[in-house]
């Protein structure tokens, strides 16, 4: 099947007709992604609270633990991706589901800090051996770029739905900040494990076998990725996006606390809900209105909007709700454009024969999520609102990289 040009990688008018053409396995993968992330968002956003209240860990110690978990995810992601390229997605998904369930159940049952940290390290496998293989498997099953792009858009949309309602359901049932919630998260991996065991065939799919290359070792795969300048540029953009985004989630609330501790709690809640709702509403229009816009141009547009939103945050020196909601709306539009399209870019730049390893390497973007709060906290302490100038500059750097590499990216994306 001929690959369509990059300008056509998003959704065409027949959205639901296209969704109906997805294999049943893709629908199942999207469903299990939603279920897992829903339970994840009931517990994970409050993990720092648990580590502070239960184990009296300092912000620096929490940052070190989270960064270590992210590093494990990156290393295992490339190794697991290479295994899935050689042996198929099934075996690595089974290992990922099993380890993730064990990790979350360990968090739920931990009676001391050492066991709790051990659980966090095991959870590094969750992102490494579940998330990238799921994306790779969907790409294997959807051979044309247009349907792959739609599947990744839908996956991101479902994750945002989970991000909106997961914490709210957790609050309603009193599950937030409770270690027992991790037990629920761990148990959600078991149905997924059973599905993979029963319905995902062992070995490679027929399409993968046709495109299979001679087996190469992990260090050779890493060398191939390291020499792939276009992919590295896209990966760096993804990391920069993650750093800016995590500043919004982790550093912005601290800044609001500095402005007015009493008003901050309510404002933070309203801002987070506004962000998630704006992303959900706006993304449904993005897929239509940006259909004819090439991927690099979409990412460039999202980066510019990201930079503008950071400048908006910099110039707000009070806790006026309307001002923060306007800034959040601008930020959310940039997020809705950037996040899914960067994922689509990384997917389409990955060679078929090494797709698992390439998508495993894409977990490097989680380093931005891990180290962002630590770096942002230091800059916030030193400069106050100046932290948003730094994130605006990072957004400009993202735009610069995309602009410089846009021609090479387009040429590669348009290759059949």
Regions from the language model: what does each represent?
Residues 2-23, 201-234:
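Juxtamembrane intracellular "pre-TM" segments in multi-pass secondary transporters
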Residues 45-60, 250-271:
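Short amphipathic helix-loop junctions that connect adjacent transmembrane helices
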Residues 74-111:
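Conserved MFS/SLC helix-loop-helix module at the cytosolic interface between two early adjacent transmembrane helices
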Residues 76-88, 281-295, 380:
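Helix-to-loop junctions at the C-terminal end of transmembrane segments
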Residues 349-382:
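A late C-terminal transmembrane helix in Major Facilitator Superfamily
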């Amino acid at each position: 099947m001929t690959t369509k040009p990059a300008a056509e990688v998003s959704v065409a008018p027949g959205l639901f007709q296209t969704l109906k053409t997805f294999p049943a396995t893709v629908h199942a993968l999207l469903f299990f992604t939603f279920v897992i992330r829903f339970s994840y968002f009931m517990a994970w956003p409050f993990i720092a609270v648990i580590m502070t209240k239960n184990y009296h860990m300092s912000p620096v110690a929490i940052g070190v633990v989270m960064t270590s978990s992210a590093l494990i995810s990156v290393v295992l992601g490339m190794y697991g991706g290479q295994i899935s390229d050689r042996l198929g997605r099934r075996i690595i998904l089974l290992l990922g589901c099993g380890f993730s369930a064990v990790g979350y159940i360990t968090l739920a049952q931990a009676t001391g800090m050492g066991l709790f940290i051990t659980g966090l390290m095991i959870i590094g496998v969750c992102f490494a051996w579940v998330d990238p293989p799921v994306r790779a498997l969907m790409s294997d099953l959807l051979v044309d770029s247009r349907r792959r792009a739609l599947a990744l858009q839908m996956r991101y949309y479902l994750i945002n739905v989970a991000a909106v309602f997961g914490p709210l359901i957790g609050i309603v049932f009193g599950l937030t900040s409770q270690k027992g919630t991790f037990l629920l998260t761990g148990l959600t991996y078991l149905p997924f494990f059973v599905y993979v065991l029963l319905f995902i065939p062992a070995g490679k799919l027929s399409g993968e076998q046709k495109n299979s290359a001679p087996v190469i070792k992990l260090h050779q795969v890493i060398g191939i990725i390291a020499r792939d300048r276009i992919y590295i540029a896209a990966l760096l953009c993804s990391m920069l996006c993650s750093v800016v985004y995590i500043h919004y989630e982790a550093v912005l609330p601290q800044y609001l606390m500095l402005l007015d501790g009493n008003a901050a709690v309510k404002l933070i809640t309203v801002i987070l809900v506004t962000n998630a709702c704006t992303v959900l509403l706006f993304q449904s229009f993005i897929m239509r209105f940006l259909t004819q816009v090439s991927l690099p141009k979409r990412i460039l547009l999202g980066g510019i909007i990201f930079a503008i939103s950071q400048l908006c945050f910099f110039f707000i020196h009070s806790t006026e709700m309307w001002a923060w909601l306007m800034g959040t709306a601008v930020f959310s539009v940039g997020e809705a454009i950037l996040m899914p399209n960067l994922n689509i870019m990384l997917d389409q730049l990955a060679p078929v024969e090494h797709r698992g390893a390439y998508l495993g390497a894409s977990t490097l973007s989680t380093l931005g999520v891990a180290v962002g709060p630590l770096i942002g906290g230091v800059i916030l302490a030193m400069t106050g609102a100046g932290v948003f100038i730094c994130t605006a500059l990072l957004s400009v750097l993202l735009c610069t990289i995309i602009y410089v590499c846009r021609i090479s990216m387009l040429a590669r994306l348009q290759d059949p």
